[in-house]
Amino acid sequence: MNSKMLRSASPAGGGLFFCWWKRGGWKCGRVEVRIGIVEVNFMKSGKRPDPNVIHPIEGYDKEIYVKPTIQNPNILVGDFTYIADSDFESHVTHFYPWSRDKIIIGKFCQIAAGVEFVMNDANHQMNAVSTFPFYTLEGWEMEQPASSDMPFKGDTVIGNDVWIGQNAVVLPGVQIGDGAIIGANSVVGCDVAPYTIVIGNPANVLRKRFDDELIDLLLRFRWWDKSVAEIDSLIPILTCSDLERVREELKARL
């Protein structure tokens, strides 16, 4: 069916009031202009984004918000981070009740199918002649090595609004900054700076996403920490490809 649109002057406030036909029903919203960026405040049939629901797409179970599904107290995940799967914890490997590390993931991260987070207990002793883990397998006479003899890289920390591509592997102790992008099939063994794209095995820097000034503005603005209502109103800014307009808008709001 071809889309239909009605337009009328807004009775209150500036801009125009639109109604349009979509998926079997009329949708309405007010359009306003701020510093050249169109902002649309949608009336969403009474539904608000809820970080505590498991399935953000009704009737589709292959994409979930991660936070409400977590059982392991050493996995900490922020609001609205999702994975393209029906389960998250199976993607965190070598993570046992006695493990000393944590995995900490921020808000609004996008984790593609097949991504794996490898934790520190995947490591074997490397300062001896053999790396074979005799102490973990029944029948062998070996005590567990001292913690100082085992590689330990610390917690794995993923920032906010990070996109991790399909089948990427994040190794123990890696820290990935806000807004970074991890290319599909990458193996990330080193830290990734905010708003940086890395690809490959081992993952190497492809480029920064933005210039240093815009990165600094985004890190100070921290849109992911704002209320759902405010983030909703910021969507036209967050999805605007005119970076100079975005830059001026952020400066005006800081």
Which positions does each model-derived feature cover?
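Positively charged N-terminal leader segments that act as targeting/secretion signals
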Residues: 5-17
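Acidic, Ala/Val/Gly-enriched low-complexity intrinsically disordered segments
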Residues: 9-12, 31-33, 38-40
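Aromatic (phenylalanine/tyrosine) cluster motif
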Residues: 17-18, 42
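Tryptophan (W) side chains
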Residues: 20-21, 26
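Extended, small-residue-rich solenoid/repeat segments and analogous flexible loops
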Residues: 41-74, 134
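C-terminal segments of enzyme domains that contribute to small-molecule binding surfaces
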Residues: 44-50, 134-135, 141-170, 203-254
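Flexible, glycine/small-residue-enriched loop-and-beta-strand segment within the central core
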Residues: 65, 75, 82-172
